[in-house]
Amino acid sequence: MIKVLFVCHGNICRSPMAEFILKDMARRAGVGQNFEVASAAVSCEELGNPVYPPARRELAKHGISCSGKTARQVTPADYAHYDRIYYMDRSNARYLARMLPADPEKIRPLLDRDVADPWYTGDFTQTYEDLAEGCRKILEEF
């Protein structure tokens, strides 16, 4: 079982989108049972809130549901539990460096560039495409 945690600022846009994109891709590839996938925030600003409506709509356009997902914050227990922790941008990396042990094999960027935060850009389609690119790479790696 490969355990993957996606992390972004608030756990209402990018990281839950990545969580459900990877779950969907793994299921469609017939390897869903080989993955445990979750997401979390580096901040506590959105704790308990559902996925942001435009992010839900973008996932729904691709036939993906994120029903029931609520924001939670990353914890030290996540470091012990997950095999890989993928962050979305350099700001997330700085927060994680204060929260978890340094471990570049386990904690790494999803892409070789920042995944723009659609909370600010409003471009949920581009975010979806970037996240799908990163999730495809994860599937290829494992």
Go through the PLM ranges and name each one.
Residues 1-79, 142:
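Conserved active-site segments centered on acidic
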Residues 78, 84, 88-142:
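Phosphate-binding/catalytic loops
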